[in-house]
Amino acid sequence: MRSVTSMRLEGCAAVSTGRIRFYVATAMHGRVSTLGRVVYVAPHLSATFAVHEAHNKLGWCVSDTESGGRAGFSLTSEDGAIADAIAELSKRTDADMRRARKRLRQLVAKA
């Protein structure tokens, strides 16, 4: 796995979605450095960083663990705006989180 993490990994698995295969590592509650970006993960969020097997491209998934870890966004774009929006999720209040999630959905729709 090529994504670089500076935190404890919760698990690692190979995940297939159609013809696309990812190696996935999940990190909880801390700091992740990957592809030159540092993302802070708040206690109520988990973040998954995936590397595309064939093209070595980064994919993202951020889940809200307060809602059972099922609500989240699966992102396979390298768009910097998406990475920025994910990083912002960890610094927001509950009201701001709703706006940030809406913004993430808009960015994903455009990607």
Model-based region annotation:
Residues A81-A85:
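Stable alpha-helical structural segments in soluble proteins, enriched in small hydrophobic residues
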Residues P43-T48, T65-G68:
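Short, solvent-exposed coil/turn segments at beta-strand boundaries
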Residues I86-V108:
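Anionic, Ser/Thr-rich low-complexity intrinsically disordered regions
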Residues R2-H44:
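Negatively charged, low-complexity tracts enriched in Asp/Glu with abundant Ser/Thr
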Residues T65-D79:
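A short, exposed loop/beta-hairpin motif centered on an aromatic-Gly-Thr core
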Residues H52-N56:
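Short beta-strand micro-motifs enriched in acidic
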Residues L58-C61, T65:
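Conserved, surface-exposed functional patches that form binding/active-site neighborhoods
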